[in-house]
C-alpha cells in the first residue's frame, strides 16, 4: 500500500512537471463568500487542503485553456483576513487575484482599498478581478455603480455563490487571465533565463569533462 501511495505522489508530481501551473489568490473581508464561491465552482470535484503553516486553504483544479492542460492552485485566506492583512508568502508568485466584497455589507466594499493597496505592494502587475457577491439577496444591486472598479480599471463581476450566477464565467476568466499573465510576465522571462543558465552550466560541465578525458588520453606514459 505504501508503494501505491508513493507511486500516486510521483504521478501527481509528474503532472505538475509536465503541465502549466498557475496560482490564483482570493482577497476580501471575512464572510464575503470567497470559500463558497470556490466550492460552487468546483462542486463535488474539489478536495480542499488545509495548510496550517501558511494559514490558508488550497483548492486544486485542472482546466483546459487553448488546448493546454492547466493545473490551477486557488489560495483562500482561511480566516487570516480577520487581521486585515495577509502574509507576504500568500502573494508570492501569484498570477491573478479575485477580490470579493458582499453587496449587502458596505464595510466590505469600503475595505477594498486596503486589500488592493496590499495586493499592489506585493504583486503590482497581476490581473485582478473585482467580485460583487450575494446578488441573489438583492438583484437591484447589479444596477448600482461601484466606482472602485472604474477607478482602478478592474473588471467587475456580479455573482452569487448561493445560486451560481456568473460563478463559472468568473473562474474561467480568472484562469485565462492568470495563464496570459504568466506567459507574458517577468515571471515567465525569469523561468526562461533560469533554463538558459542551467543549460549553460550543463554545457560547461560537459566541456570540462571532455577536456579532462582528452588530457588523460594525451598524457605520456611514465618511463
From Swiss-Prot:
Region Disordered: start-end pairs: 200-223
Protein name: Rab-like protein 2A
InterPro entries hit by this protein: P-loop_NTPase, RabL2, Small_GTP-bd, Small_GTPase
Polar residues bias: start-end ranges: 210-223
Job description of the protein: Plays an essential role in male fertility, sperm intra-flagellar transport, and tail assembly. Binds, in a GTP-regulated manner, to a specific set of effector proteins including key proteins involved in cilia development and function and delivers them into the growing sperm tail.
GO CC terms of this entry: intraciliary transport particle B; sperm midpiece
SMART domains hit by this protein: RAB (SM00175), RAN (SM00176), RAS (SM00173), RHO (SM00174)
PROSITE patterns named among the record's database cross-references: RAB
Molecular function via GO: GTP binding; GTPase activity
UniProtKB keywords: Ciliopathy, GTP-binding, Nucleotide-binding
Gene this chain is encoded by: Rabl2
Binding site for GTP: 28-35, 76-80, 133-136
Expression sites by tissue: Isoform 2 is expressed in the testis and localizes to the mid-piece of the sperm tail (at protein level). Isoform 2 is expressed at higher levels in testis than isoform 1. Isoform 1 and isoform 2 are widely expressed and notably within other tissues containing motile cilia including the lung, trachea, brain, ovary and kidney.
Family: Belongs to the small GTPase superfamily. Rab family.
Region forming the signal peptide: none
Subunit structure: Interacts with IFT27, IFT81, IFT172, ATP6V1E1, HK1, LDHC, MAPRE1 and HSPA2.
Species of the source: Mus musculus (Mouse)
Disrupted-gene phenotype: Exhibits phenotypes characteristic of ciliopathies. Pre-axial polydactyly. Retinal degeneration, characterized by loss of the outer nuclear layer that contains the cell body of photoreceptor cells.
Pfam families (UniProt xref): Ras (PF00071)
Alphabetical GO biological process terms: cilium assembly; flagellated sperm motility; photoreceptor cell morphogenesis; single fertilization
Amino acid at each position: 500500500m505504501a508503494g501505491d501511495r508513493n507511486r500516486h505522489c510521483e504521478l501527481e508530481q509528474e503532472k505538475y512537471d509536465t503541465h502549466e501551473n498557475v496560482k490564483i489568490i482570493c482577497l476580501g473581508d471575512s464572510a464575503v463568500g470567497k470559500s463558497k464561491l470556490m466550492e460552487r465552482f468546483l462542486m463535488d470535484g474539489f478536495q480542499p487542503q488545509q495548510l496550517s503553516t501558511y494559514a490558508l486553504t488550497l483548492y486544486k483544479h485542472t482546466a483546459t485553456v487553448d488546448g493546454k492542460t492547466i493545473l490551477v492552485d486557488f489560495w483562500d485566506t482561511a480566516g487570516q483576513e480577520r487581521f486585515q492583512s495577509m502574509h507576504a508568502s500568500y502573494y508570492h508568485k501569484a498570477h491573478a487575484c479575485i477580490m470579493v466584497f458582499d453587496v449587502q455589507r458596505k464595510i466590505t466594499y469600503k475595505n477594498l482599498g486596503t486589500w488592493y493597496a496590499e495586493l499592489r505592494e506585493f504583486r503590482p502587475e497581476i490581473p485582478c478581478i473585482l467580485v460583487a457577491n450575494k446578488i441573489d439577496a438583492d438583484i437591484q444591486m447589479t444596477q448600482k455603480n461601484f466606482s472602485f472598479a472604474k477607478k482602478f480599471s478592474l473588471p467587475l463581476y456580479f455573482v452569487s455563490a448561493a445560486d451560481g450566477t456568473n460563478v463559472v464565467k468568473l473562474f474561467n476568466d480568472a484562469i485565462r487571465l492568470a495563464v496570459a499573465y504568466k506567459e507574458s510576465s517577468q515571471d515567465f522571462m525569469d523561468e526562461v533565463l533560469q533554463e538558459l543558465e542551467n543549460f549553460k552550466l550543463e554545457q560547461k560541465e560537459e566541456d570540462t569533462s571532455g577536456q579532462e578525458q582528452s588530457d588523460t588520453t594525451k598524457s605520456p606514459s611514465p618511463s
